[in-house]
From Swiss-Prot:
Subunit structure: Homodimer.
Name this polypeptide is given: UDP-glucose 4-epimerase
Induction: By D-galactose and D-fucose.
Source species, domain of life: Bacteria
Pathway involvement of the protein, from the record: Carbohydrate metabolism; galactose metabolism
Organism the protein comes from: Escherichia coli (strain K12)
Length: 338
């Protein structure tokens, strides 16, 4: 298939592009490089074993989107492009709604003009809000996300659901993922956050490699086994595989298809720190800090629907997530070259 991957040079997008190329698909990457670097592109090609086409541009440029969809005879779109820092979204709500909601509107309007009807959306477990029951199941009603980031994901899900009702021949997958971590096992591709990392694993990795002094663990008084927050961590390679499987199985299958992509188990912040200490062979310096507003004590996925319907399940452990992250970070202490 000929696949347009928006945000394809970012963390999850780049790993997914490698898996798509390895599966023989033709990949066109669209990215404005606001959160990624051009130097990842040759790595994608080398690991994928095939050349991807790259277009530098913005999903909010509807004319450019229409041109790409037409000129490359795109069959399906996997949509990763968007801003993703929860804390930043509270400070910059308009930028998040413009990029994530308006950007997606421009993209699907271009798809309609180009008669492309297969769409995979990179959604998030944040759309569930605060649920009374764990694990989270796709049949749960969506909640009220705490941040503009989460709200933007939920708004896009609602827009896509309305679109599919009005245009019943569209196939739309809403992939709700939990906490992606890890890196390509080669050690040559991984998460390379710009500035201070917003997520746990890259922050731990930067402490271990000497770029940061200490990890702040927000809250050690939660009603969990060790008092720290519990989340569902999924290896980015398992997540990438989930996108490829969803794309291949759901192409031209009309409907809105909703799947949780998670490991189906919860691990605490201290579990992750301990796994990383084991991977890098030394203790990771950390300290406790007050809880962050809006953080939930614990949640994880019920991913049995994806197992049942897509024959997809995670195969990589927390130890492998830590080992692969350390392999990447220790080989590339400063991330990708500028």
């Amino acid at each position: 298939m000929r696949v347009l991957v928006t945000g394809g040079s970012g963390y999850i997008g780049s790993h997914t592009c490698v898996q798509l190329l390895q599966n023989g698909h033709d990949v066109i990457i669209l990215d404005n490089l606001c959160n990624s670097k051009r130097s990842v592109l040759p790595v994608i090609e080398r690991l994928g074993g095939k050349h991807p086409t790259f277009v530098e541009g913005d999903i909010r440029n509807e004319a450019l989107m229409t041109e790409i969809l037409h000129d490359h005879a795109i069959d399906t779109v996997i949509h990763f492009a968007g801003l993703k820092a929860v804390g930043e979204s509270v400070q910059k709500p308009l930028e998040y709604y413009d990029n994530n909601v308006n950007g997606t509107l421009r993209l699907i309007s271009a798809m309609r003009a180009a008669n492309v009807k297969n769409f995979i959306f990179s959604s998030s477990a944040t759309v569930y809000g605060d649920q009374p029951k764990i694990p989270y199941v796709e049949s749960f009603p969506t909640g009220t996300p705490q941040s503009p980031y989460g709200k933007s994901k939920l708004m896009v899900e609602q827009i896509l659901t309305d679109l599919q009702k009005a245009q019943p021949d569209w196939s739309i997958a809403l992939l709700r993922y939990f906490n992606p971590v890890g890196a390509h096992p080669s050690g040559d591709m991984g998460e390379d956050p710009q500035g201070i990392p917003n997520n746990l694993m890259p922050y731990i990795a930067q402490v271990a490699v000497g770029r940061r002094d200490s990890l702040a663990i927000f809250g050690n008084d939660y009603p969990t086994e060790d008092g720290t927050g519990v989340r569902d961590y999924i290896h980015v390679m398992d997540l990438a595989d989930g996108h490829v499987v969803a794309m291949e199985k759901l192409a031209n299958k009309p409907g809105v298809h909703i799947y949780n992509l998670g490991a189906g188990v919860g691990n605490s912040v201290l579990d992750v720190v301990n796994a990383f200490s084991k991977a890098c062979g030394k203790p990771v310096n950390y300290h406790f800090a007050p809880r962050r507003e809006g953080d939930l004590p614990a949640y994880w996925a019920d991913a049995s629907k994806a197992d049942r319907e897509l024959n997809w399940r995670v195969t990589r452990t927390l130890d492998e997530m830590a080992q692969d992250t350390w392999h990447w970070q220790s080989r590339h202490p400063q991330g990708y070259p500028d």
